[in-house]
């Protein structure tokens, strides 16, 4: 296969300083470099780039379920929720989910990019779907 993995994730942000604070405090990102209009972080081993773009439309982003999901341990769920609240992060109402589907917290960065912190794994999700969703086809 030619594709080896995800190289980096890039977000357009409206205010670089505000976003740097969010990615450091909330996501515990390691700031690697900062320029006039860009910043690079390492988050969970992944390169995350922020590019400041002040003149693009941002309203459409709120209508999509598109998001980046991070894995968290079940025992860290409440601690993360508390950190989000302490940093005045916009926490989204999550979808209704079966207890077998584990737990998630959905929230946004200052520009409305959606994030999820999820306690489950892909294997757990597939097993739950096999048990509860007979209309699905598995390969």
Curated annotation (Swiss-Prot):
What is its EC class? transferase
- Please provide the record's keywords in A-Z order: Antibiotic resistance, Cytoplasm, Magnesium, Metal-binding, Transferase
Entry EC no(s): 2.5.1.-
- UniProt superkingdom: Bacteria
PROSITE patterns, per this entry?
Answer: VOC
Q: Which GO terms describe its cellular component?
A: cytoplasm
User: What's the subunit arrangement here?
Assistant: Homodimer.
Q: What is this protein called?
A: Metallothiol transferase FosB
Species name for this entry? Bacillus cytotoxicus (strain DSM 22905 / CIP 110041 / 391-98 / NVH 391-98)
């Amino acid at each position: 296969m030619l594709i080896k993995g995800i190289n980096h994730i890039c977000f357009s942000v409206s205010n670089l300083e505000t976003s740097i604070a969010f990615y450091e405090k909330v996501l515990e990102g390691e700031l690697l470099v900062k320029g006039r209009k860009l910043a690079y972080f390492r988050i969970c081993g992944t390169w995350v780039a922020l590019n400041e773009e002040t003149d693009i439309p941002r309203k459409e982003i709120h209508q999509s379920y598109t998001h980046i999901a991070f894995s968290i341990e079940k025992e860290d769920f409440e601690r993360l929720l508390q950190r989000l609240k302490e940093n005045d992060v916009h926490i989204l109402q999550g979808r209704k989910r079966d207890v077998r589907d584990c737990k998630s917290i959905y929230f946004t960065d200052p520009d409305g990019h959606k994030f999820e912190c999820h306690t489950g794994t892909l294997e757990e999700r597939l097993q739950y779907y096999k048990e509860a969703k007979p209309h699905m086809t598995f390969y």
